[in-house]
């Protein structure tokens, strides 16, 4: 059977949505588990970890019979690898990994990763102050950095963000019912209406907000988890389920 086109119709079962859900839960929850283990006493971390595991435990439910379902096809096709590579390039050229010129916001981001890699957890500075920041995005890469060094942590930051973007794209495909490269482009390029307003020379009220690409450049640590969570949530509300 010839492989489907890049925008071939794609119901949930064609993605092996169970595996996709587990990948998404792992991406969202692994930093939480690392935080529980690294920042909290065991008598607080253990019950919270057990509660998290209980919430993820599969439950038996009656599944509606599916009719006329299309045969599943491999997820990792050439088009999928192209999207994965494009997201990796987006992360790298946005400054993550510290290999290209960075937005000034990365001064704080880089320092956060270095402290998480080099300092014991929880991070307490010599003057008694503690590291208070939205550190979740860096925790898994920083844990790898403690084992393999800061360079390994930088590489994993890029890979971690790339995988989060890739999962977001997959859930967009589930949401729309099609595996489409255009969805990846729209997701990455979705931006402010202020650009259109400026191009047309309209002196109206400001329609500005930070687009996806700008958010990834400045704050992928905050924007990618939110993007993935809400696309995942919206996809779960589709009539397909």
What is each model feature region?
Residues 1-70, 188-194, 198-202, 206, ...:
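Membrane-embedded, hydrophobic transmembrane alpha-helices
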Residues 11, 224-241:
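Membrane-interface transmembrane helices that cradle and orient dolichyl/undecaprenyl
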Residues 21-26, 78-85, 183-184, 221, ...:
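Alpha-helical transmembrane segments of integral membrane proteins
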Residues 26-35, 86, 138-145, 166-167, ...:
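Hydrophobic, membrane-inserted alpha-helices
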Residues 37-39, 53-67, 93, 173-177, ...:
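Structural signal for the C-terminal ends of transmembrane alpha-helices
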Residues 68-76, 178-181:
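Membrane-interfacial entry segments at the cytosolic side of transmembrane helices
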Residues 74-99:
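Helix-loop-helix transmembrane hairpins and adjacent membrane-interface loops
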Residues 93-228:
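Active-site lumenal/periplasmic loops and adjacent helix-entry segments of GT-C-fold
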């Amino acid at each position: 059977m010839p492989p489907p086109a890049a925008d071939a119709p794609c119901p949930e079962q064609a993605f092996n949505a169970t595996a996709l859900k587990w990948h998404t839960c792992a991406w969202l929850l692994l930093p939480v588990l690392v935080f529980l283990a690294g920042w909290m006493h065991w008598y607080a971390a253990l019950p919270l970890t057990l509660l998290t595991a209980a919430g993820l435990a599969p439950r038996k439910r009656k599944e509606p019979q599916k009719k006329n379902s299309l045969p599943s096809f491999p997820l990792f096709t050439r088009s999928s690898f192209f999207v994965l590579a494009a997201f990796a390039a987006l992360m790298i050229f946005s400054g993550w990994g510290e290999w290209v010129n960075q937005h000034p916001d990365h001064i704080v981001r880089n320092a956060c990763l270095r402290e998480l890699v080099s300092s014991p957890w929880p991070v307490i500075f010599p003057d008694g102050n503690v590291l208070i920041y939205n550190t979740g995005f860096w925790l898994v890469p920083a844990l790898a950095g403690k084992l393999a060094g800061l360079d390994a942590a930088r590489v994993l930051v890029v890979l971690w963000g790339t995988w989060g973007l890739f999962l977001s794209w997959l859930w967009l495909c589930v949401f729309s019912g099609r595996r489409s490269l255009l969805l990846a482009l729209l997701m990455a390029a979705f931006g402010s209406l202020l650009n259109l307003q400026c191009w047309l020379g309209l002196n109206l009220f400001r329609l500005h907000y930070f687009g996806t690409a700008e958010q990834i450049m400045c704050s992928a640590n905050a924007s990618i988890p939110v993007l993935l969570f809400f696309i995942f949530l919206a996809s779960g509300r589709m009539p397909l389920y």
